[in-house]
Amino acid sequence: MLMETLSRWIGGVNDVLWTYVLVAALLGCAVWFTLRTRGVQFRLLGEMMRVLGESAGSGPKGERHVSSFQAFAVSLASRLGTGKLAGVATAIVVGGPGAVFWMWVIALVGAASAFVESTLAQLYKRRGRDSFIGGPAYYMERGLGRRWMGVLFAVLISVTFGFAFNSVQSNTICAAWEGAFGADRVWAGVVLTALTLLIIFGGIRRIARVSGVIVPIMALGYIVLALGVVLFNLGRLPEVLELIVADAFGWEQTLGGAVGAALMQGIKRGLFSNEAGMGSAPNVAATAHVSHPVKQGLIQTLGVFTDTLVICTCTAFIILFGGVPDASLNGIQLTQAALESEIGPAGGVFVAVAIFLFAFSSIIGNYYYGEANIRFITPRPWALTLYRLLVGAMVLFGALATLDLAWSLADVTMALMTLCNLAAIVLLGRQAFLLLADYTAQKRQGIKNPVFTKDRIPELKDKAECW
């Protein structure tokens, strides 16, 4: 009885936060930042690709740092969870094909928020024991002078990503492998937990190396498969694109209220998927060794595009080419059924393997978000060790448990975390605009590789510890 009451209460809070408050706040900030940066996500798309190719730098002792690409891979690892396979399917079932169009829109506009938060994370980063550290908690303390706000954010993100989200990813992996291969959930959970602990106890550089290998392989593999499905159904591509656009704006949908459903589902799933403005990706953006803070802003903007415009679109095409979505199937089952209809029984096996790669990479990416914030709360080594062990325990717990209540609670903490971050980046946004102006000014002067030092912008001189 108590659990039912608690579940209903949490569900009510979620409805208010996600239907009204959070969607309005995220959209409003995304549009504002797009206007203030003059569409940085569109103007500097070519520069994003150039920066992504930069190699790791060397520090004063010659040690290797986290490169732009590795930071991109870790943040993309967290974004590329099972939501890419299940979340898009759910959006299509609930909101119709038109939800895909609104996911595209929110990615294009929301990318500006990702640029601002990651640029600020670079500006306010600090030197850690084995890498740079930073993120929203750090710019809340140093930029706004409000440590309490940083601690609140740090607690929320550590619980949300390290515990709740990782439990869900673990649960999805073990359920998929049990269904596809008959794997015992207990042993699957033990193996998954051991792999997780092995990697996270190696620190950010091991996490970056593993992500730098897994993410390109799984993303490219999934894209190649999706392209194969598209080529096989090339004659139907205009029909599917027309279906997406018509369902987003058609008269039938308008009269039936379906446009509103498509809009809400597309926005909610898009925001949840690409994390723009949530305050998660800046934690890893701060670790990169770059010559100018704007570079990581550009890299993380590209991450939003890769996540939604590429990976999520692949899933949408696979499902829509498979026919009318079956509302009786859940997200993962729908994607699996759609693939099986295209390539036969091998599709189910591919989904099981893809789920493992997507979800496992997400687990280690999510963990690092928590690590950066545990270090903000306290520098004591035992606290980080305890957190790592608790993350491992939650991965094992997730493999064996049902997680409906935990997932609903995570939605609440994630919403509060996001609102906290949005308030901070709106207040500090002008500093990101100044950095962008400095970067583009250097490019106009013919400088191929812009460099930032704190004396270039007097207003930021006391803010930049590492510049």
What kind of feature is each model-predicted range?
Residues 1-82, 93-98, 426-467:
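N-terminal alpha-helical transmembrane segments of multi-pass membrane transport
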Residues 29-34, 106-130, 136-137, 141-171, ...:
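Helix-loop-helix module between adjacent transmembrane segments
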Residues 59-93, 120-123, 129-137, 141, ...:
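Alpha-helical membrane segments and immediately flanking helix-loop junctions
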Residues 25-32, 37-49, 171-177, 184-232, ...:
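Membrane-interface loop-to-helix entry segments
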Residues 5-6, 36-41, 83-88, 97, ...:
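Transmembrane helix-loop junctions in multi-pass membrane proteins
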Residues 115-124, 129, 225-243, 257, ...:
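Extracellular/periplasmic helix-exit of transmembrane alpha-helices
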Residues 39-67, 90-92, 96-100, 104, ...:
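Flexible loop linkers connecting adjacent transmembrane helices
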Residues 11-50, 93-130, 306-312, 412-422:
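Extracellular loop-to-transmembrane helix junctions
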